[in-house]
From Swiss-Prot:
The gene is mnmA. Belongs to the MnmA/TRMU family. GO terms for cellular component: cytoplasm. This is tRNA-specific 2-thiouridylase MnmA. It comes from Alkaliphilus oremlandii (strain OhILAs) (Clostridium oremlandii (strain OhILAs)). HAMAP family: tRNA_thiouridyl_MnmA.
Amino acid sequence: MSKAPKDTKVVIGMSGGVDSSVAALLLKQQGYDVVGIFMKNWDESDELGYCTSAEDYEDVRRVCDQIGIPYYSVNFEKEYWDRVFTYFLNEYKAGRTPNPDVMCNKEIKFKAFLDHAIKLGADYLATGHYAQVDYSDGEYRLLRGVDTNKDQTYFLNQLNQYQLSKAMFPVGHLQKKDLRQIALDAGLATASKKDSTGICFIGERNFKEFLSNYLPAKPGKIISLDGEVKGKHDGLMYYTLGQRKGLGIGGAGTGEPWFVVDKDLEKNILYVTQGETHPSLYSRGLIGADLQWVSENPKPSVIKCTAKFRYRQPDQGVTVYVEEGNTCRVMFDEPQKAITPGQAVVFYDGVVCLGGATIDQILK
């Protein structure tokens, strides 16, 4: 960082949550020229979406007033609809389970919002993510947050060198409990606010009900792997591989619980199997699409590393075979359960996040 903090303008994306509130406070304490910006990504007048954005913006206003920084709201509803929500619906239509957070970071926070921040004269864009950036051997590296339980590099895996060169993660070195304490000690309005969970535009509402407003549900049969009809499903898009709850089959006296093992989109059949250790729930590898490495240095065609296939999962040993057209074949050291097409596979070397891909196919 060549300029002194007081001459360095940092735009911080504020959500109204405690993480971004403390991030803003720390930047201000470190002497940066800080501006808080609240992103509005969903149209609240659209009754189908649930949004707490009016309350959240009020929290941003209160925190920014407390710490003495200017604040604005910026509207990215159109960009969000075009680049994230349309993708979200298309993935569900294709029978997959998308991860809108990964796409939102790639296309909105660190693209549309970053562009906006730079137009405002910002040197950096900061967020409340639990992650860290460092500069080593002429490249930026994305590192896990110190609080391993909160680390959010899984959702940031698609960020490139330019995006990381402009990113600041002021709370990445903190444990969550210490972050809360900082907020309480400073008397921040958001100090005791609970963390948001779930997909931002659905909020606390029923997921099935939300999705049915946008995509027509096509009920069909639930069939076991040995061909027996077990019941009816409400529409394949409502089910995820490995899912156990909400199938409406089984119950007391029917033996082990049932799990979703496959979806046949053409025939509109949901396949299930009984028992959580059934071999059909496991796979030995996957094909990844849209592979993006954080580093721009040439990669070997075969890489031994660890990977996560879902957020907060312990790292698993893998071998990545880099193939043409931004695809890769990932073979697991140990068979993995319930790998889900549409989700992210994210690669690590110790604390360094190497990048990631979208799970495209499962290799049984």
